[in-house]
Design a protein with these regions (language model features):
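Glycine-rich phosphate/pyrophosphate-handling loop used in enzymes and phosphotransfer proteins
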Residues: 1-231
Length: 231
């Protein structure tokens, strides 16, 4: 599930974290209850996606075939994400977690998000093993959707690189910094057409990955434009 804790790995980290905890106690990023980054009550409210009843292309929780959005784009395969797996619905608690991590400076959530992704893979391996055989079980490496240079400067770190490194440790496969992303406008306020146009040709492959089976991860999938362009 999503109730997780991550003890520091070195004596220095334990001293540092204990001092920080005294000065500024950890609070739940969703409800501000003291004690943990995500409290048990908020974790219990997270709506996970059952892969058995998810769109085969984008992973949305709208049935076991193609959702209506993917059906409408079925003739434009180059612009649509394919064979995606989503951990949970991006609303309520998960939305607060991602915002606290990306824009609120709570970098400790990288491990939490990585565990959520790993939990989704584990559930899918049990529920839809044939589908998972297609990419997860034999993956050679993890690749992450990189931040734009502007987003990196604003946040001071690449949020998905940190998640990818945690996730790759859980999966037992290496992480590759294989993609470079050029500056583009923020997609959060764009519609479907705008997202597709914005994402097109936004990425370059900067590592030799030909012939490899890769797990591409990102924090949020809306229209699938980013995942399609990056893949």
């Amino acid at each position: 599930g999503f109730v997780l804790s991550y003890p520091p790995s070195t004596p220095w980290e334990r001293v540092r974290d204990a001092t920080l905890e005294l000065l500024s106690p950890t609070r739940c990023v969703a409800c501000e209850c003291p004690g943990s980054l995500v409290c048990d009550a908020c974790a219990a409210r997270i709506v996970t996606i059952d892969p058995v009843f998810a769109c085969l292309r984008c992973g949305a929780p709208f049935g076991s075939l193609l959702c209506t959005e993917c059906q409408s784009e079925s003739s434009q395969d180059d612009q649509v994400a394919n064979n995606c797996l989503a951990a949970c619905v991006f609303e309520g608690v998960p939305a607060r977690i991602v915002r606290a991590y990306k824009d609120g400076g709570e970098r400790r959530l990288a491990a939490w998000i990585a565990h959520a992704l790993f939990d989704a893979v584990h559930r899918a391996q049990k529920a839809v093993p044939k589908r998972m055989d297609a990419f997860a079980l034999d993956a050679d490496a993890v690749v992450f959707v990189p931040a734009t240079p502007a987003a990196y400067r604003r946040r001071g770190f690449d949020h998905m690189e940190a998640v990818a490194r945690e996730f790759s440790n859980l999966m037992g496969i290496p992480v590759l910094d294989a993609l470079a992303k050029w500056d583009a406008c923020d997609q959060r306020k764009l519609g479907r057409g705008g997202r597709l146009a914005n994402a097109a040709d936004a990425y370059d492959v900067v590592e030799p990955v030909a012939g490899m089976r890769l797990l591409l991860i990102d924090d949020v999938i809306t229209t699938g434009a980013t995942m399609a362009a990056a893949s």
